[in-house]
Curated annotation (Swiss-Prot):
NCBIfam families: pimt (TIGR00080), PRK00312.1 (NF001453)
Official protein name in the record: Protein-L-isoaspartate O-methyltransferase
Pfam families linked: PCMT
Gene designation per UniProt: pcm
An annotated Gene Ontology molecular function: protein-L-isoaspartate (D-aspartate) O-methyltransferase activity
CDD domains, sorted: AdoMet_MTases (cd02440)
Organism: Nitrobacter winogradskyi (strain ATCC 25391 / DSM 10237 / CIP 104748 / NCIMB 11846 / Nb-255)
Catalysis: reaction(s): [protein]-L-isoaspartate + S-adenosyl-L-methionine = [protein]-L-isoaspartate alpha-methyl ester + S-adenosyl-L-homocysteine
Gene3D superfamilies from the UniProt entry: Vaccinia Virus protein VP39
Length: 217
């Protein structure tokens, strides 16, 4: 019989799948291992929490596929002393992963229900270097300052200059870019002295990023 602290089979497969699909950054893998995805999914989806699939949450949004979470996180090359902006809090799962790898996360959510739930969940689980804001991801207030890294977790037809202007020198931004329906492409931007360096990564499918704060929900 395995020891009491032996990971359940589904979590072992979760970890193995990330490695098989090319996730190699040990800090990212540890964060994916330590953040309990089952605490961020809907009650009825707990049995599927460790499956490599996106799951629905409130307000018609989703908690992203674990591979995509790990991939986007790895591509940001996060450091312990960095400040990160996340657009699209959702359940707070990606937020929690980021918080284990940097100094501070500011995350913006347009749905009050999701923002309130994520804030309470993250506080309960002890992720204390996170600030959850109800707001418009297309219009970040000036007092928020600039960030070393920016992650967008909803599809944009183009990356607004208002976001790239928030990047510190040598900062990185990752976002799904493309039509609101169908597939998008993950784009990685780096702020270089001569301007933005753009790199196309993998095809993905995200819910659309919408401007403004939701009047309902």
């Amino acid at each position: 019989m395995p020891p009491a602290d032996h990971p359940p089979p589904e979590k072992m497969m979760f970890q193995l799948n990330l490695r098989r699909r090319g996730i190699s950054d040990q800090r990212v893998l540890r964060a994916m291992d330590n953040v309990p995805r089952d605490a961020f999914v809907e009650q009825g989806d707990r049995e599927d929490a460790w499956c490599d699939t996106a799951l629905g949450i409130a307000c018609g949004q989703t908690i992203s596929q674990p591979f995509v979470v790990a991939y986007m996180t790895e591509r940001l090359e996060l450091g312990d002393d960095q400040r990160v902006l996340e657009i699209g809090t959702g359940s707070g799962y990606q937020t929690a992963i980021l918080s284990r790898l940097c100094r501070e996360v500011v995350t913006v959510e347009r749905y009050r229900v999701l923002a309130d739930r994520a804030r309470a969940r993250l506080k309960h689980l002890g992720y204390d270097n996170v600030e959850v804001l109800l707001g418009d991801g297309f219009d970040i207030p000036g007092e928020a300052g600039r960030f070393d890294r920016i992650m967008v977790t909803a599809a944009m037809e183009q990356i607004p200059e208002a976001l790239t202007a928030r990047l510190e020198p040598d900062g990185l931004l990752i976002a799904p870019v493309g039509p609101q329906s169908g597939r998008q492409t993950l784009i990685l931007l780096r702020r270089a002295p001569a301007g933005m360096i753009r790199k196309e990564l993998i095809d993905v499918r995200f819910v659309p990023a919408l401007p403004g704060i939701a009047r309902e929900l």
